[in-house]
């Protein structure tokens, strides 16, 4: 299954397009601080990015290389506006819909929608919300907003004309690996997440997901 992950489009990482990052970031290392640095301009800057970084012509190019699966990372903020978050909540879903519809209708591609970050931070990496953010674990409020994001992504897929052409990746690399604790033993939950803590959030994830519309027909 030839596939491509479309980094740096609906979620930003400093290593993907270094020229763009250098132009806009002010020396920051993650999207959270990028948005804070841009202040009132972060919306227009990111909207221009969404419109230009990936276009139907790029999908055409991928199709000529026999790519048949697109994995598209998004931030949690693409799906739900989280109070206190620096991440931008704008027209990400509209851009996702446009490219996904084109890829599916013209080339019968499969699209994996990836929710790449969660409120509070699920792994401490720059792409996990922000560098050093581990606050998702054992945080009921963060979990509730995460489930709202998952529910919104499911609604997006269910409202499409090609539900069978999508897969949802509801969480990316959840692990609270702080450098100061790197010599300790990890606890691995039944969902595959790893944690030094009690895994309460990870343990709740599976039954909570079962209550969501993932299980509806």
Sequence positions of predicted segments:
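N-terminal carbohydrate-binding accessory modules
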Residues: 1-67
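Short, low-complexity, polar/charged sequence segments that are solvent-exposed and flexible
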Residues: 21-25, 90-91, 130-132, 187-189
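An active-site-proximal structural segment forming one wall of the substrate-binding cleft
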Residues: 41-70, 84-117, 127-168
């Amino acid at each position: 299954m030839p596939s491509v992950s479309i980094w740096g489009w609906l979620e930003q990482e400093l290593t993907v397009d270094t020229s763009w990052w250098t132009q806009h970031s002010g020396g920051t290392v993650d999207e959270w601080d990028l948005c804070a640095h841009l202040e009132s301009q972060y919306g227009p800057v990111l909207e221009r990015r969404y419109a230009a970084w990936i276009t139907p012509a790029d999908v055409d190019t991928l199709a000529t290389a026999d790519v048949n699966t697109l994995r598209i990372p998004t931030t949690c903020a693409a799906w739900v506006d989280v109070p206190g978050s620096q991440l931008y909540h704008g027209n990400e879903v509209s851009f996702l819909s446009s490219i996904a519809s084109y890829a599916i209708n013209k080339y019968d591609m499969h699209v994996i929608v990836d929710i790449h970050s969660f409120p509070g931070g699920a792994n401490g990496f720059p792409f996990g919300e922000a560098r050093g953010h581990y606050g998702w674990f054992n945080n009921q409020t963060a979990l509730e907003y995460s489930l709202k994001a998952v529910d919104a992504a499911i609604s997006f897929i269910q409202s499409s004309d090609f539900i069978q052409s999508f897969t949802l990746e509801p969480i990316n690399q959840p692990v609270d690996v702080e450098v100061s604790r790197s010599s300790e033993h990890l606890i691995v939950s039944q969902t595959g997440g790893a944690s030094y803590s009690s895994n309460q959030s990870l343990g709740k994830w599976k039954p909570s997901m079962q209550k969501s519309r993932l299980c509806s027909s």
